[in-house]
Regions:
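Bacterial N-terminal signal peptides
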Residues: 2-10
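Secreted/extracellular ectodomain signature
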Residues: 13-138
């Protein structure tokens, strides 16, 4: 999470105060089940939106990161649902991860979608020019 803070600060500091930042596209690569790290991602999203509301953001979860969007397991369900209601944001889960964890798609929070392969999704996003921010447990 510290690395994300440094990158976010550099992005914000690099913007000229009098200019409107150009929208960009970023994917948060989340594999941790630590509620503090998951909450930090939501905070980064709020801060990015406060500076640049047109930025496209995707939170991609695989491994233990899936807990953020599983009904009955997520401690942040209300925050995720609120964030999704503002647009320019998607929460996506790796189908391999949920299959390995025996999670059915029906257990995911509303409006959370799946991708066949989380790592493949990240690679595809990078090819499309998306920034990739790896969120690591601390």
């Amino acid at each position: 999470a510290i690395g994300v803070c440094a990158l976010f600060a550099a992005t914000v500091i690099g913007a000229q105060p009098s200019s409107r930042p150009r929208p960009y596209k970023v994917v948060f690569d989340l594999t941790t089940d630590d509620p503090k790290d998951q909450a930090a991602v939501l905070n980064y999203i709020r801060e990015i939106r406060s500076v640049n509301p047109d930025t496209d953001i995707e939170v991609l979860m695989y491994g233990r990161g899936t807990s953020m969007v599983v009904t009955g397991r997520s401690t942040l369900a209300d925050d995720v649902n609120h964030a999704l209601g503002r647009g320019h944001l998607s929460f996506r889960v790796c189908e391999i991860a949920i299959r390995n964890q025996k999670i059915d798609k029906s257990q995911l929070l509303p409006n959370v979608t799946t991708v066949p392969d989380g790592i493949g999704e990240i690679v595809a996003k990078q090819k499309e020019g998306w920034g990739d921010i790896k969120v690591v447990a601390h």
